[in-house]
Amino acid sequence: CQVPAYISYLPDTEKTFMKRLKENGYYTAVVGKQHFAESTIDKGYDYEMIVDGHFPTAPKEQLGVYLDYLKENGIEPDSLYEKNLISGGTWKGDIKYHIDNFIGDKGKEWMENRLSDTENKQPWFFTLSFPGPHHPYDLEGTKYADMYELNDMEFSESTYEDLEQKGPQFRNMGMYSQIYLKDYTKEQFLKTKRSYYANITLIDEKIGEVLEVLKKYNAYDDTVIIYTSDHGDFMGDYGLVEKLQCLEESLMRVPLFVKPPIKDFEGVHIKDDVLNIDVAATCME
């Protein structure tokens, strides 16, 4: 593909699969993160509410409607978060002001508005994309973090030195990281990991609320649902915490659930390797 890394821009001559769905009669919409960056390509959405960054470290121009929401409610962004963990910290505000809570609520709102319009028979394709789970890991101090006991959490046994046993592409990747476990205490790391888990739990809760809207309008059984992520984090593997651009198990092994439009579908676990690139082709079929 002549693409050295994922940080690249789609040329205007390309056509997204959302655009193809739109051309074939679907109403297309997105709420949340897209990461098209500086590309000026037509994304192919009829409706857009894009929030590209992960608060609180993202440039303000990427946070758009989320910052507007905070301002409308008299919330100063810097008051919501205290940095006191490894690449993360403690959430100090009401959880309803967290960016992933905001995205989830807006996704639920879109779904409610769409399905309540019973006169509209046009098929739809909806992307709900959460900025998290992502550094900074900012949900320590919340009810979601309280679900996890530090004593029950695992501390990675692999270290930065273990990279020396691997190929050059792995031996060199550590130099690009700025976060090393050796610089922190075990408690600091476990709280950071708990905050990461808490972010996942918050997102799971918000997705559940959207699914309940589908069930409320008897649309769940007829809807294809794809749940996935773009990457994982090291979370202690090789003594690293965040992510890097490399082919490493903890970064690449992400969830990919597909619920077909089949009533009472029980599920099948497929162990074959699959790629996110297959999602577009699956949607087009």
Predicted regions and their residues:
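Formylglycine-dependent sulfatase
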Residues: C1-E285
